[in-house]
Amino acid sequence: MREAICIHIGQAGYQIGNACSQLFC
């Protein structure tokens, strides 16, 4: 679930997706 969210956010904004990846993924 979290991985899918990270991918979705990454599509919206690479910087936000990268931050999410560091925090959750």
Curated annotation (Swiss-Prot):
Record InterPro entries: Tubulin/FtsZ_GTPase_sf
Main location: cytoplasm
Residues holding GTP: 11
Cofactors required: Mg(2+)
Entry superkingdom: Eukaryota
EC number(s) recorded for this UniProt protein: 3.6.5.-
Enzyme class: hydrolase
Substrates-to-products reaction catalysed: GTP + H2O = GDP + phosphate + H(+)
GO cellular component, one term: microtubule
Keywords linked to the UniProt accession: Cytoplasm, Cytoskeleton, GTP-binding, Hydrolase, Microtubule, Nucleotide-binding
Residue ranges of the TM segments: none
GO molecular function term, any single one: hydrolase activity
Methyltransferase listed as a keyword: no
Compartment(s): Cytoplasm, Cytoskeleton
Similarity comment text for this entry: Belongs to the tubulin family.
Function text: Tubulin is the major constituent of microtubules, a cylinder consisting of laterally associated linear protofilaments composed of alpha- and beta-tubulin heterodimers. Microtubules grow by the addition of GTP-tubulin dimers to the microtubule end, where a stabilizing cap forms. Below the cap, tubulin dimers are in GDP-bound state, owing to GTPase activity of alpha-tubulin.
Subunit structure, as described in the record: Dimer of alpha and beta chains. A typical microtubule is a hollow water-filled tube with an outer diameter of 25 nm and an inner diameter of 15 nM. Alpha-beta heterodimers associate head-to-tail to form protofilaments running lengthwise along the microtubule wall with the beta-tubulin subunit facing the microtubule plus end conferring a structural polarity. Microtubules usually have 13 protofilaments but different protofilament numbers can be found in some organisms and specialized cells.
Protein name, entry field: Tubulin alpha chain
